[in-house]
Regions:
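ABC transporter nucleotide-binding domains
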Residues: 1-147
Length: 147
């Protein structure tokens, strides 16, 4: 059971397995034909059977050529896309069968940096401000000195 409150943020609840498990993840997007009567003619297999684990304390860099499914994989893990099939577990909890409210709380514990980090940085902010902003938004820090 996952317990998330403002005072007590405990998403692991004693779990000591892999932090993130992705098993046979697939995300297929339909290709349609026709203007009025759209008919599915094919699927684009953006992600087709990816499997990996990340243990606590590890960092994973998903690297590949443009259009190979890196961003789609991250969006599926965060449940911004509903995968076609597969299983995603975060600290032992299946994310493919979780309420939107619980998923919002789980996202506080996840971080995905999408493709071009330099394009996503605000030149008017310091690195500390950029890193600290999500901590402040999710109320995980009380002030600037903590990050």
């Amino acid at each position: 059971m996952v317990s998330v409150t403002e005072q007590n943020l405990d998403v692991t609840d004693g779990y000591d397995g892999p932090m993130l498990e992705v098993n046979n993840l697939k995300m297929h997007f339909p290709v349609t034909s026709g203007v009025i009567f759209q008919k599915k003619v094919a699927d684009v297999k953006a992600v087709d059977g990816i499997t990996f684990q990340i243990k606590k304390g590890e960092t994973l860099g998903l690297v590949g050529e443009s259009g190979c499914g890196k961003t789609t994989t991250g969006r599926c893990i965060l449940q911004l896309y509903s995968p076609t099939s597969g299983q995603i577990k975060f600290n032992g909890r299946d994310l493919t069968d979780i309420s939107k409210k619980d998923m919002r709380a789980m996202r506080r514990e996840m971080q995905v940096i999408f493709q071009d980090p330099y394009g996503s940085l605000n030149p008017r902010m310091t690195c500390g401000d950029i890193v600290g902003e999500p901590l402040k938004v999710h109320k995980l820090t009380s002030g600037k000195g903590e990050y």
